[in-house]
């Protein structure tokens, strides 16, 4: 999980989710794309 100042979709499989006030990018197929904003 990468922590970045700004998160973007890197592929079509990415899903943007808000949990507990944080923005996450989750990808089950390619887990390298997982990111958290903050």
UniProtKB/Swiss-Prot annotation:
* Recorded superkingdom: Bacteria
Q: A single GO molecular function, which one?
A: structural constituent of ribosome
Q: Name one GO cellular component term.
A: ribosome
Keywords from UniProt, A to Z, are: Ribonucleoprotein, Ribosomal protein
Q: Which GO terms describe its biological process?
A: translation
Hey, which family's this protein in?
Belongs to the bacterial ribosomal protein bL36 family.
For this entry, the protein name equals Large ribosomal subunit protein bL36
> Which species is listed as the source?
Phytoplasma australiense
Q: Which gene encodes it?
A: rpmJ
């Amino acid at each position: 999980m990468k922590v970045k100042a700004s998160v973007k979709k890197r592929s079509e499989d990415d899903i943007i989710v808000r949990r507990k006030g944080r923005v996450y990018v989750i990808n089950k197929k390619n887990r390298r794309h997982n990111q958290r904003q903050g």
